[in-house]
Amino acid sequence: MSLKDSAKIALSLMDLTTLNDNDTDEKVIALCQQGKTEFGTPAAVCVYPRFVPIARKALKAQGTEQVKIATVTNFPHGNDDIDIAVAETKAAVAYGADEVDVVFPYKALMAGNEQIGFELVQQCKAVCQASNVLLKVIIETGELKTAELIRKASEISIKAGADFIKTSTGKVPVNATLESARIMLETIRDLKVADRVGFKAAGGVKTAEEAAQYLALAQEILGHDWVNSDHFRFGASSLLTNLLAALNGQANQKVSGY
């Protein structure tokens, strides 16, 4: 596949993201506008819960209401208070989110507690399922570090009902890597849940070339047809600039951001 072809696919699989402490209505509207490109739209925009209604309005105003709106809960620290995670997820759904990205209590798992992660995901899934909202679970691979823990967090999340497993918050030093992606994709394959569980690489994917590597990896493990927006996403902000550069035959630009 040519770089242009993979860049076009990657754009359609993006969750175009702004999760900054200084986000404003204006910044969220600008993000939605960035997603309306001559090469199509991303799968979703991802914003903090309070900005979901503004994003909905902005997407509708520009005629791109097919773009989903994702948000985050238990974010970014992945605390182990189930009640708070569930309350935040209920609030996110009430704001009108189509998709919720919840942070798995990864520190609890690192301390040996598997049950709390299962229960947290299971209860957030119940909230989402009742409103037909997709649940993505962020396992924070850069903090789990070992293949064993990355696999365990993936397995627990899937068994508790995750619709997607996602690498990272983008708020820790190490975010998505091909190594952690391979472990997560192989877990989806090994548990035989590829028909109902997707994968999201988040943070650190900044160029069309890098995106192409993730697409190739997913196709290698789960098959060419599996890679679509129902099963595969990139969580990113700066990636869009370089995908558009590749599609226009231009060089990568140095971009800051997620």
UniProtKB/Swiss-Prot annotation:
UniProt-listed InterPro entries: Aldolase_TIM, DeoC, DeoC/FbaB/LacD_aldolase, DeoC_typeII
List of catalytic residues: D101, K166, K200
GO molecular function, one term: deoxyribose-phosphate aldolase activity
Keywords from the UniProt entry: Cytoplasm, Lyase, Schiff base
Subcellular location: Cytoplasm
EC class of the enzyme, as a word: lyase
Keyword Lyase: yes
Catalytic activity: 2-deoxy-D-ribose 5-phosphate = D-glyceraldehyde 3-phosphate + acetaldehyde
Pfam family, one: DeoC
Record GO biological process: 2-deoxyribose 1-phosphate catabolic process; carbohydrate catabolic process; deoxyribonucleotide catabolic process
UniProt pathway annotation: Carbohydrate degradation; 2-deoxy-D-ribose 1-phosphate degradation; D-glyceraldehyde 3-phosphate and acetaldehyde from 2-deoxy-alpha-D-ribose 1-phosphate: step 2/2
E.C. no: 4.1.2.4
CC annotations in GO: cytoplasm
Source domain of life: Bacteria
UniProt cross-references to SUPFAM superfamilies, sorted A to Z: Aldolase (SSF51569)
Family: Belongs to the DeoC/FbaB aldolase family. DeoC type 2 subfamily.
Described purpose of this protein according to its UniProt entry: Catalyzes a reversible aldol reaction between acetaldehyde and D-glyceraldehyde 3-phosphate to generate 2-deoxy-D-ribose 5-phosphate.
Matching HAMAP family: DeoC_type2 (MF_00592)
Official protein name in the record: Deoxyribose-phosphate aldolase
Organism, scientific name: Actinobacillus pleuropneumoniae serotype 3 (strain JL03)
Gene: deoC
